[in-house]
């Protein structure tokens, strides 16, 4: 059965979601510039959500992906960067993209790699994680 789960941030502009190995749902919020996580094990209320503001000036988070180590990757358009978020430490690392206006709309990967198709440049970047 499917059910609608609304992020708690008003008009957040959710763009992409990805789940981790624990079944938590990670959400890229374009309008708010947040990375949010919903934990269904905690129910449907406000306490089932956690939210982190992406670093940088006026962030816009578009795509999100969780790798095989449960590290969360997010594309941040305003600062043309990839964000690496460690849920354990709750810290972001910022990785600038090598080409202007990469505009990553979807992130994929396999163990040891994160694939970044750049819709703005028609390149594919790969980050080696292992």
Q: Which residues fall in each region the model found?
A:
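Intrinsically disordered, low-complexity linker/propeptide segments enriched in Ser/Thr/Gly/Pro
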Residues: 1-7, 26, 35, 39-41, ...
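Conserved beta-strand positions in repeat-built beta-propeller and related beta-rich domains
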Residues: 25-31, 72-78, 116-120
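A short loop-to-beta-strand structural motif that recurs across blades of beta-propeller domains
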Residues: 34-37, 81-83, 123-125
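Ankyrin-repeat and related helical/solenoid repeat scaffolds used for protein-protein interactions
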Residues: 65-114
